[in-house]
């Protein structure tokens, strides 16, 4: 059962609560063709007053007795059964113009609760049985969850099915090395769209994470490509550090560009660079100008004050070797490469940054 196919208006588990009331509850079914030739679109509704529960999905024809596509395509009365491990829906009504509707009666499977109990689950009551039937909780599924060691309750079996957790997904996750996950963990990681490949890549990268840590990475857009790029660039980071990088916009392209320029700033520096708009190109050009050994604070200070790499390179070409602080101070006072060139050409050489700044401040041009 795919969770995208299930619409729950007041919550799947609330459906059981609605049925549990002593008041009369309406139960109706509707049917039409599906886009798949071996399925029909089957809707089951249960309602009372303003409370409304609806099950809505494409269902294999094999789940029905006494129903065929030919029956659906011909007008007339409808009598068929929807049969699953937890029980049956006895449906009656009418078909017309390839659509059908009517009412149903739920008939529980009396042996199903006992079989669940043998596996260690709480025996469901009739209302729970109806909900288990609608979410297709089979004995095979219950047995697989039990054998996987998830320690699930009867209600959690239903939650697993609602959110699309399959036995194949559980097996794939456990093969990837996550044998500590329990039923709630599987529901949570499935809600956040964590694929088995991502879990496997985390393990291969040496990360042994809890479900919540995995989810935190996923929420902030960390994918396998980003993890691999970090690893290839030589970064061994904690999940919290990786998350922080993503939060501040450090992406795979940024990491790859740094690597292509032969640069590997510290992880904390990466965050500051992103915050202040320091690009890999800016770092490379500083390095090419002879400023490859600057600290993160020195680099960000240059960027904050608008010191361009062109000015840095031109100053070097003119024979100046200013400190990062000098470059910032000169830029603040409006000193550009043209001013430095005019000083040199006028014979004023071997001046330090403070002297040049004072000349500029006093209007010597």
Cite the ranges covered by each PLM segment.
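General marker for long, soluble alpha-helical cores
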Residues: 2-5, 18-365
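Bacterial N-terminal signal peptides
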Residues: 10-17
